[in-house]
């Protein structure tokens, strides 16, 4: 008699797929070979800390395999990958962290020659190398002599040189204090609690672009003189009428005619002019034009 569920087909993506995948992974006990800084939590993982790492082969150096150890930080669960380096016989942190440099690591490194150049293989190459070195030494000698002569010329009289430097420092200090006062007044006016950096060329270009854009949007507003519109004179109304005919008429061809009231007519008779044209009327957030004439004969 067959048992329960015997002979039943279970697909690879079934409920046992995860358990099968876990069996394929090579999980080992890995010990950190050196101190490592975590890039996520900025904490240090000390040397000798042990982890459950996934070991897998990622390449080879000649016939030596290169292994990768994937682990997670014990403080923030940040994934860290450590690879073997067969060429230099050490480990490297590939991602997720960085190695902490210690003094003993510097002392253990092999010393390198100051002029780590390849040895010439023949006499012609050796001669070319010698000529190049002589040319370089001659150039360096001329530069050193120039610097020495310049220092001797500038500091031939220490008192005059010191006086000149103090004068430059005083002028620079005055400029800095003046700029600091300007920045402080700006911070007080704008209620800022940040440091104001000196302006740059890019800031100036951006400000000009913003200004041009803003002036372009408000072109018809800039033409209007608000001080003159507030003055109770006929010249004000005539100026605004001329502006309204050239500006608002183009934008609103279906402007409504406005019939002035009796009170407005009585006020307009006080003006010394004969013709009054144009007045802006705002009703329900809309702009309407006025184009009418009032003569002295009307009663």
UniProtKB/Swiss-Prot annotation:
InterPro entries per UniProt: Saf4/Yju2 (IPR007590)
Any Pfam family matching the protein: Saf4_Yju2
Keyword vocabulary terms for this entry: mRNA processing, mRNA splicing, Nucleus
Location in or out of the cell: Nucleus
Domain of life the protein comes from: Eukaryota
Similarity comment text for this entry: Belongs to the CWC16 family.
Name recorded for this polypeptide: Protein saf4
Species this protein is from: Schizosaccharomyces pombe (strain 972 / ATCC 24843)
Chain's gene name: saf4
């Amino acid at each position: 008699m067959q048992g329960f569920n015997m002979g039943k087909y279970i697909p690879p993506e079934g409920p046992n797929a995860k358990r099968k995948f876990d069996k394929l992974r090579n999980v080992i006990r890995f010990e950190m070979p050196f101190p490592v800084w975590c890039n996520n939590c900025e904490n240090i993982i000390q040397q000798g800390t042990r982890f459950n790492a996934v070991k897998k082969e990622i390449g080879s150096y000649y016939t030596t395999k290169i292994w990768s150890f994937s682990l997670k930080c014990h403080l923030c669960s940040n994934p860290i990958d450590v690879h073997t380096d067969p060429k230099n016989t050490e480990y490297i942190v590939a991602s997720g962290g960085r190695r902490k440099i210690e003094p003993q690591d510097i002392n253990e490194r092999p010393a390198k020659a100051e002029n780590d150049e390849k040895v010439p293989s023949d006499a012609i190459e050796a001669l070319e190398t010698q000529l190049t070195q002589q040319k370089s030494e001659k150039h360096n000698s001329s530069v050193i002599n120039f610097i020495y002569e310049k220092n001797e010329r500038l500091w031939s009289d220490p008192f005059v040189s010191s006086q000149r430097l103090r004068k430059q420092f005083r002028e620079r200090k005055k400029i800095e204090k003046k700029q600091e006062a300007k920045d402080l007044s700006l911070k007080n006016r704008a209620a800022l609690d940040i440091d104001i950096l000196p302006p740059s060329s890019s800031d100036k270009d951006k400000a000009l672009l913003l200004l041009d854009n803003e002036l372009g949007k408000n072109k018809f507003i800039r033409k209007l003189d608000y001080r003159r519109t507030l003055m109770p004179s006929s010249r004000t109304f005539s100026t605004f009428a001329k502006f309204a005919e050239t500006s608002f008429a183009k934008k609103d061809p279906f402007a409504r005619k406005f019939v002035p009231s009796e009170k407005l007519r009585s006020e307009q008779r006080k003006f010394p002019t004969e013709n009054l044209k144009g007045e802006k009327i705002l009703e329900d957030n809309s702009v309407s034009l006025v184009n009418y004439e009032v003569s002295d004969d009307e009663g």
